[in-house]
From Swiss-Prot:
One of its GO terms (biological process) is microtubule cytoskeleton organization. It comes from Homo sapiens (Human). Residues 51-146 form a coiled coil. This is MAP7 domain-containing protein 2. Residues 347-357, 375-386 have a biased composition (Low complexity). Interacts (via N-terminus) with microtubules; facilitates microtubule stabilization. Interacts with kinesin-1 family members, KIF5A, KIF5B and KIF5C. It comes from the Eukaryota. Keywords: Acetylation, Cell projection, Coiled coil, Cytoplasm, Cytoskeleton. GO terms for cellular component: axon; centrosome; microtubule; microtubule cytoskeleton; midbody; neuron projection.
Length: 732
């Protein structure tokens, strides 16, 4: 629109210009008087139309500008809106990414925590399995020891039967680790030992003597103490490594050694007759494991046959051997358990590796197999005991049932006690493991905190170091900048000084050049002046020579009458307005040695010289001087200064010249010279001449203010201008 408006404006201009050109053409007619008024009206109309057009165009431009501004504001608002939407979208995307990252981190953290918990559970299971395997292995070893405990103590013809009898007697002892099974086995072995079949196979020589039987009977209190010992040993059987470090280990080892020495120190004796042994074979008790069994054994003792032969006499030690072995059995058993526990503790410590675990698993499998076998054997033995107890000495089935129920109750109680102890031990182990895990977690957290603190300290030190390095760099940069600025200022100062020096040098050179030029100009002027003065001097000399020639040619009588001095002088003197006396006196004017020209009037008297040679080196001219009128121009000052006027003057003697004191500057300069030596004739004639020419117009000057080099100065100062001079009467 602006361009269109501009085009319309430009298009309207030629119309206005054409209109303006056509209107003055109509007005400019000959005879039109009022030409100004018709010219003003069309110009005003044209200006009015142009102003309307300009206002319209300006209004259109304003509207267009407002539209453009509104459109631009709308675009800016739309752009801001788009930018805000884009920013919000970016922020939402960023928050979404942050949320996803946080969720991923939470999932990762949860997975790590779950994995850690899984590892802890696996570790707990592994430790529990190890503990269980170690316990099972300990029980298996104790079971093996229980079965292998009855070794042959004597060598004889019935050795195998004795070994079987001893093994069956030892099997009757209850074990602390497996009380139900051992009790069943013990009861079954007791029942078997008292059964007719078993008695039928027993060798009669191994039976002990009758009088020694009461010593082998065990009291109920003794059986209770044995149960307590077995329960305490059972409670300590689960502990793998702690019992090995107990304080009573040395005493137990000593007891084991002492029992072994007593067992090995027993002498081997010969048994009695077979008949006697067979007589006592049915009634000898085999150290029962419970008071009930001992009672049955005592009841069965009197039923032995009396027709048997008396036994051979033997040593009491022989018959006490089973009792001694029965007394030493718990000690040996406890010692073996302690040694096995120590060995199991070392094995449990070494079982952390995979090979140890595999070996433990193999032992567990073997132990389970042996437990199953032992359980089956125990069940069979229990059944056989239930069947054989009435035949072994119990006549009442109810009493046997009570005994069996009591045994089962005791086995159940012992099993519950062992289970409770096992649970307590597992709980204690779990608490210990949790405590260890808690301590390990605390240690890990402490180490992480220390590492975090160290990392923060390291970062802080690095930041401080970086900050210090940045400060040092900034200071170094500022110092370098300051030095650069100082060097720049110094260079600028040096450059300025150099420029000033160069300017001063240039000024000096210019001054010297100017002085040389001035001196050269003055020298040239002086030379020119000297040449001019020399030329003037030569001209004056020529004129003086001419004057002298004319004066010599004129034949004037030497005797002139005093009464007629004017008549003799008037026809010969033709004086112009100005005369010029040249005295070759040298003086300095503006530093130049020039010859001063002394200008005087016509009536100036010639200088008088008191001596032949004055201080300026000039000699007075002798003879008469005739002043004649010259044909020069007397009205111009240049001619009066440049030309020397000559006149015919009669020669005056030295004395006559000295006799004029009024007008001689030499008289003032040299006051000691007397002027009254000659007569007054010449003075009178000169006075008349001065009266004819007129009085002097220059003032007198004192001799104090004059020097020898300035003797003609009062003449120069007394020089009158042409307007002030009086015209002289010249005689033609």
């Amino acid at each position: 629109m602006e361009r269109g408006g501009g085009g319309s404006g430009t298009g309207s201009r030629p119309e206005g210009t054409a209109r303006g050109t056509s209107l003055p053409g109509k007005i400019a007619e000959p005879g039109a008087v009022r030409t100004s008024q018709p010219n003003y009206r069309p110009q005003g109309m044209e200006g009015f139309l142009k102003s309307d057009e300009r206002q319209r165009l300006a209004k259109e431009r304003r509207e267009e500008r407002e539209k453009c501004l509104a459109a631009r504001e709308q675009q800016i608002l739309e752009k801001q809106k788009r930018a805000r939407l884009q920013y919000e979208k970016q922020m939402e995307e960023r928050w979404r990414k942050l949320e996803e990252q946080r969720q991923r981190e939470d999932q990762k953290r949860a997975a790590v925590e779950e994995k850690r918990k899984q590892k802890l559970r696996e570790e707990e299971e592994r430790l529990e399995a190890m503990m269980r395997r170690s316990l099972e292995r300990t029980q298996q070893l104790e079971l093996k020891k229980k079965y292998s405990w009855g070794a042959p103590l004597a060598i004889g013809p019935g050795g195998h039967d004795a070994c079987d009898k001893l093994s069956t007697s030892t099997m009757s002892l209850p074990k602390p680790t497996e009380p139900p099974m051992n009790k069943r086995l013990s009861s079954s072995t007791v029942a078997i030992s008292y059964s007719p079949d078993r008695v039928f196979h027993v060798c009669p020589r191994l039976a002990p003597l009758g009088p020694l039987n009461p010593s082998y009977k065990s009291s109920p209190t003794r059986n209770i103490e044995k149960k307590k010992a077995t329960s305490t040993s059972t409670s300590g059987a689960g502990d793998v490594g702690k019992e090995a470090l107990s304080g009573g280990e040395a005493s137990l080892v000593e007891k084991v050694k002492r029992g072994q020495r007593t067992a090995t120190s027993l002498p081997v004796v010969n048994f009695g007759s077979p008949l006697r042994r067979c007589e006592f074979s049915g009634g000898i008790p085999k150290r029962p494991s419970s008071p009930v069994i001992s009672k049955t054994a005592t009841k069965a003792y009197p039923q032995s046959p009396k027709t048997t032969k008396p036994p051979y006499p033997g040593s009491p030690v022989k018959y006490r051997l089973p009792a001694l072995s029965g007394q030493d059995m718990p000690k040996r058993k406890a010692e073996k358990e302690k040694s096995n526990k120590e060995r199991e503790g070392t094995l449990a410590q070494q079982a952390a590796g995979p090979q140890g675990e595999e070996a433990l698993e193999k032992h567990v499998v073997d132990k389970h197999a042996s437990e199953k076998h032992a359980a089956a054997a125990g069940g069979k033995a229990e059944n056989s005991a239930a069947l054989g107890k009435p035949t072994a000495g119990t006549t009442d089935a109810g009493e046997a049932a009570k005994i069996l129920a009591e045994k089962r109750r005791q086995a159940r109680l012992q099993k519950e006690q062992e289970e409770q102890e096992r649970l307590e031990k597992e709980e204690q182990d779990r608490l210990e493991r949790e405590e260890l895990k808690r301590k390990a977690e605390e240690e890990r957290l402490r180490l992480e905190e220390e590492a975090r603190k160290q990392e923060e300290e390291r970062k802080r030190q690095e930041e401080e170091k970086k900050k210090q390095e940045g400060e040092e760099k900034r200071k170094a940069g500022e110092e370098a900048k300051r030095k650069a600025e100082e060097e720049l200022l110094l260079k600028e100062k040096q450059e300025q000084e150099k420029q000033e020096k160069a300017m001063i040098e240039k000024q000096k050179e210019a001054a010297e050049t100017k002085a040389r030029e001035v001196a050269e100009q003055m020298r040239l002027e002086r030379e020119q002046i000297m040449l001019q003065i020399e030329q003037e001097r030569l001209e004056r000399k020529k004129r003086i020579d001419e004057i002298m020639k004319r004066t010599r040619k004129s034949d004037v009588s030497p005797q002139v009458k005093k009464e007629d001095p004017k008549v003799g002088v008037q026809p010969a003197v033709c004086v112009e307005k100005k005369t010029k006396l040249v005295v070759p006196n040298k003086m300095e004017i503006n530093g130049l040695n020039t010859c001063q020209e002394v200008n005087g009037v016509d009536h100036a008297a010639p200088e008088t010289y008191p001596q032949d040679i004055f201080s300026n080196g000039l000699k007075p001219a002798g003879g008469l001087i005739h002043l004649d009128a010259l044909d020069g121009k007397s009205n111009s000052l240049d001619d009066s200064t440049e030309e020397v006027q000559s006149m015919d003057v009669s020669p005056v003697s030295k004395e006559e010249l000295i006799s004029i004191p009024e007008f001689s500057p030499v008289s003032e300069m040299i006051p000691g010279v007397s002027l009254d030596q000659n007569g007054t004739g010449n003075a009178r004639a000169l006075q008349d001449l001065l009266d004819f020419t007129g009085p002097p117009t220059f003032p007198k000057r004192s001799s104090e203010n004059l020097s020898l080099d300035d003797c003609n100065k009062n003449l120069i100062e007394g020089f009158n201008s042409p307007g002030q001079e009086t015209p002289l009467n010249t005689f033609c």
